Design a protein with these regions (language model features):
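Active-site and donor-binding regions of nucleotide-sugar-utilizing enzymes
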Residues: 31-166
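Membrane-proximal basic amphipathic "stem/tether" segments
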Residues: 1-36
Length: 166
């Protein structure tokens, strides 16, 4: 979550501009981008490792946005690119498939993109759209969001301003 009223305003305004730009850029059907800034862990690591074990790294180009790419030397000579947030704009705009885990990118996916927010748990507190102080912003920057169980769909729909079936 972006803290501070003005930082949030700049963040979401920039996201609107990038969302428009994204519609103009063709998507690569063989490109996958993981936005896991804090690192490959929990759900991001599980999905990433599954894709590696199943051989997706050959036919697909896989980009991982992490804080410290040097932590992942084992992927250096594979079909995986580890990169910082500063170098991630092009992969984010070109990828057909986007995966993130709560560290939202304020860019709306286009009709030619599939964006999955595999949220890391169930919120026990108010988050995003549930908090009045965060203002009237959209938080549904994904095509789908995962919930730990059907009982939590309503909570996610309220928090992210999305439909329960997303």
């Amino acid at each position: 979550m972006v803290k501070g009223k003005w930082k949030r305003k700049i963040y979401f305004t920039g996201g609107k501009v990038l969302s428009v730009l994204s519609r103009l850029i063709p998507k690569d059907p063989k490109r996958v981008c993981f936005f896991c800034k804090s690192g490959l862990d929990d759900n991001s690591e599980a999905l990433f490792r599954y894709m590696m074990e199943q051989g997706y790294a050959g036919p697909y180009r896989i980009d991982c946005v992490v804080d410290d790419p040097a932590q992942y030397p084992q992927w250096k000579n594979s079909h995986v690119s580890m990169m910082t947030v500063r170098k991630s704009l092009w992969p984010l705009l070109r990828s057909r498939y986007l995966f993130c885990h709560g560290e939202m990118v304020a860019i709306m996916p286009t009709k030619k993109q599939v964006s999955v927010n595999y949220w890391h748990g169930t919120p026990l507190k108010k988050i995003n759209g549930m908090m009045e102080k965060l203002g009237d912003y959209r938080y549904d920057f994904f095509t789908y969001i995962t919930a730990a169980a059907p009982a939590f769909r309503k909570i996610f729909a309220e928090a992210f301003g999305c439909r329960e079936e997303q």
